[in-house]
Amino acid sequence: MFDIEKLINELTLDEKISLLTGFNSWYSNKIPRLNIPSIKMSDGPNGVRGDSTSNKSSACFPCPISIGSTWNKKLIKKVGIALGEEARDKDVDVLLGPTINLHRHPLGGRHFENFSEDPVLTGKIAVSYVKGVQSKQVSACLKHFVANDTEFERHTVSSNVDERTLRAVSYTHLRAHETR
């Protein structure tokens, strides 16, 4: 049986830090002495982008706001399965998606990457999408969780949201897996 505690204890502090940063935008660092491989990631809200070394083409699915508007969990799971298959074909370990932020502001320039303004719908769709991707032994990495409503100064902006709104609206979709 694999002993994660033993492995963590064998890692040096520098090795632990290196696992938190990454080799580049698409690969994690590897630790050869402990047989820890690099993990390959890929982005794309509606397709498996791959990396610049891949010459394989990508399928382009409708953007998440379009598939979210179907309210069809079975269809969205099939999209997830297809994305998982394509990711596997490109040797991708982790698909960076889905994006689960809610549409909270009409000027949100990346809302097309999100499923909906409705937290319950977003949560249920995200669960189906993730189950589809992960059925192909590819990890799905949820991103843009809460209060990511603007592209203006996106790396430094402060999204100030009161606790009541966070609990009543912004966090609701994060509990969708509890109500299968």
Model-derived segments and their meaning:
Residues M1-R175:
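Glycoside hydrolase catalytic-domain context in secreted enzymes
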Residues A176-R180:
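A short, hydrophobic C-terminal helix/tail in secreted or cell-surface proteins
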